[in-house]
């Protein structure tokens, strides 16, 4: 709750969500009020930014990418209802599709990684596969392209493709981070 007092509430929503179940009714009420305010602000800004993404101008691609980057911190905390989480993730994917169609070069490897992770969370494996493939096509020598595929195949239980991606990764001179190593250990 100290993060909230300092104003760093957007990255603390999961903690605020936990405080909703506090035995102290005042704490629970305060947490509910903050969470409701933050989520209402989030919904409003998403709608505002979404409308900017629909405007056909020279900033359209940047607006789409910025919306994805804006949505991700809230979506990754999974504080929305399941239905709204799914809807917002689909909207995130939709605006990234628009950016990709217009100028895929402006999409960074981290943005691909974010959308893949959110799609995995809602178990939309078909769309996640599409974005994993696009990330690999555009960033074939970047670790996140491989970790996205590894996470996808891990989530689907597809050992054959998981090990195929792992072998491809081994052939490259890419430093593997601890998260990827742990994923590989878990699946073996």
What would you call each of these model-derived segments?
Residues 58, 100-107, 139-141, 174-175:
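Short coil turns that delineate tetratricopeptide repeat
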Residues 29-36, 40, 56-79, 94, ...:
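Amphipathic alpha-helical repeat scaffolds of TPR domains
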Residues 2-7, 18, 29-37:
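Structural detector for internal amphipathic alpha-helices that build alpha-solenoid repeat scaffolds
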Residues 3-4, 71, 78, 115, ...:
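Residue at a conserved register position within TPR or TPR-like alpha-solenoid repeats
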Residues 15, 67, 114-115, 149:
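Structural register within alpha-helical repeat arrays
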Residues 9-20, 44-48, 129-131:
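Amphipathic alpha-helical scaffolding segments comprising HEAT/armadillo-like alpha-solenoid repeats
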């Amino acid at each position: 709750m100290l993060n909230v007092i300092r104003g760093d509430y957007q990255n603390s929503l999961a903690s605020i969500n936990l405080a909703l179940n506090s035995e102290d009714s005042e704490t629970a009420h305060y947490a509910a009020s903050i969470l409701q305010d933050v989520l209402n602000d989030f919904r409003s800004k998403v709608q505002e930014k979404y409308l900017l993404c629909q405007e056909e101008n020279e900033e359209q691609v940047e607006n789409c990418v910025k919306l994805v980057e804006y949505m991700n911190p809230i979506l990754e905390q999974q504080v929305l209802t399941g239905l709204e989480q799914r809807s917002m993730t689909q909207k995130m994917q939709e605006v990234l599709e628009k950016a990709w169609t217009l100028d895929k070069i402006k999409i960074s490897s981290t943005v691909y990684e974010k959308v893949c992770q959110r799609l995995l969370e809602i178990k939309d494996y078909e769309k996640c596969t599409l974005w994993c493939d696009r990330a690999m096509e555009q960033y074939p020598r970047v670790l996140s392209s491989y970790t996205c595929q590894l996470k996808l195949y891990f989530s689907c239980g597809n050992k054959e493709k998981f090990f195929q991606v792992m072998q491809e990764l081994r052939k490259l001179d890419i430093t593997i981070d601890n998260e990827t190593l742990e994923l590989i250990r878990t699946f073996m």
